[in-house]
Amino acid sequence: MGVLSKFVIAVAATTAVFAPFAYATRPMENLGRGVVAVRSNETAVLVGWRLLGLDDEDIGFNVYRATGSGDPKLLNSKVLTGGTNFQDLSPDLGESNTYHVRPVLNGKEEAESGTFTLTADHDEEPLVRIPIKAGGAIKFLWVGDLDGDGEYDYVIDRQTAPSTIEAYRSDGTFLWEVNMGPNSENQNNIEPGSSALNVGNWDGMTVFDFDSDGKAELAVRIANGVVFGDGKTFDDGDSDDDQYVAFINGETGALRATAKIENDYLSDGPLAARFGVGYLDGKTPHLVAFLKNRQPGQGAFNLIMAAWTFDGKAVDLAWRWLRGDQAASDGHNTRIIDLNGDGKDEVCEIGFALNGDGSLRYSLSDQGVGHGDRFHIAKMDPSADGLQGYGIQQDNPDLLMEYYYDADTGKLIWKHYGDEVGDVARGMAGDIDPTTPGMEVWSFSGVYNAGSNKLTEEDTTLAPWPQLGLWWNGDALLELYNDGKIEHWDWENPSVSGKLPRYFKIGDYGGSVGTRNPLFIGDILGDWREEFVVTNADFDELLIFSTNFPSDIRLYTLAHNPAYRNAMTLKGYMQSHHVDYFLGDGMETPPKPDISYVGA
């Protein structure tokens, strides 16, 4: 089992009232409490809920349960002021049990925000099942509050030809489908069709409330032949290689607005895309696109970075950046995060970073960094200023394998070299060892403490597989997701990656490993810990895994952390999300996020 937390984190917060749509800070989702309940063992139920980013530091909670058709009864003997979860030790599991929580502030109980019902004779499993329509394989899921009720709804892709997109309310109610048309049928993972989605490292879509009206939109790259949720077909392009960014109504699937993607390399074909979201001016959500195509004969890649805003009526191009012959290496995932603490997000690739205005902030090429598959930016060293980055390399001619750097300036702090050219392929960052301060980083050459550049285990064969991490078991250390297995690193008894202590496999509950990654990882229900979503083998059910471990740690929902919420919009080669403060063993109380709630 993991280490039990030895501390309780209190979140400093204040309440405030903001004028609708006039935001001095970044507007973020006006979330509800996200109440969830799962069986924690044979006789008990774990109930979890959100602490919100702007909750008062003195807020407490009461938990209520209604059994069957009975009236709600208070479960806790005193107001709960620790972790935002509660273990119900005496439910009648033969009946349905409906839970809700009520905030308590200054001795006054406030209104409830949503309920969750655990059905009678529910299986003992750490997950919520959401039935969906039968259909083709699913690669990714995005979340956003499509209907404005304060809870996350779901948007999925279908790996069919043509590709399709489906939207569901949080309870599984089907909303709409978008058919990506004949130009999505070319699903080559390097040079896909002009409206193809989610092949290779390309996604070409994301979900967010771009106009800050309280309801999320789908942003997607489209071309001729796309059929929207209201049945209308898009045909504005002069040719099938003409592409557009489209903002689609999250409730209806109808088109709201488009902007043509300027393709300076149209003679080389349509542009493949990765999408994400950042507040590049500090207060306005921007759609950020990483766009590439390839010159003939397996030639060089053309790269365009671009950003747009959507105000509810029109789409405006904020900027474009063309790499051209500049030395600036890219990879297979993007990070959008405020590097210098000025409130404005930067756009980061594995080998360079752009400022929020689209200008080049720095390139790592002059320090020997080239293409690689994965990189991370986080508060890895709590004793150092700012944020740090860690990346790995693919076939670096100078034999560079992995590196660690100052994410604000791009200055490399340490490098590790190999004996021959090789593709490192995987790299992870997270706090998995409480005996050293800060995060660990690792690929396939051992686990290193990031800040000190020292091995935590001299035998470098004893290391976890560097795939994905998630907070799960109740302490502040990171657990591990690898190929459908939830595991943790036992720093006292290190082992090879195939023999780590394991909590469960998703197959134990009918989950399909699929592409070996989940459809989504992120904090979308309950307290601050993360959920992950997979599907069953028939692709007609979403399995949303949510922790069944109690925790004393009190943190505001990770979805109200600016860096983390940006990360939830990104796919590419799926990577773990990070907050902009140090989250790990021995952490300090994180600062209150500088946000406002839309519509508050």
How would you name each of these model-derived features?
Residues 10-11, 22:
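Cleavable N-terminal signal peptides
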Residues 37-38:
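Intrinsically disordered, low-complexity regulatory segments in eukaryotic proteins
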Residues 1-9:
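Bacterial N-terminal signal peptides that target proteins for export
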Residues 25-33, 42-44, 51-56, 66-74, ...:
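Beta-propeller-forming repeat regions
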